[in-house]
Regions:
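DUTPase catalytic domain/fold
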Residues: 1-80
């Protein structure tokens, strides 16, 4: 399967696997920011992705993010 990724900003970091055998890739924001308690924010990643027809990309919390910092993503589905 081929997934096309296009940088929308020069400082964007293309998703990558942190460790061999990881089930998912790490995503990185292109901006630094602070979150206030209970604040919600859309996080800019700086790239676009083309998911093949019949598939979806899933966005999940990084291991320990919620437990250590109380930060929870609302998950995401990137349709083809």
């Amino acid at each position: 399967m081929e997934i096309k990724i296009k940088k929308l900003r020069d400082d964007a970091i293309i998703p990558s696997y942190a460790n061999k055998g990881d089930a998912g890739m790490d995503l990185y924001t292109v901006e630094s920011f602070d979150l206030e308690p209970m604040e919600r924010k859309t996080i800019p990643l700086g790239f676009a992705v083309e998911i093949p027809t019949g598939y979806a990309g899933l966005i999940w919390d990084k291991s320990g993010l919620s437990h250590k910092y109380g930060i929870k993503t609302f998950g995401g589905v990137i349709d083809s």
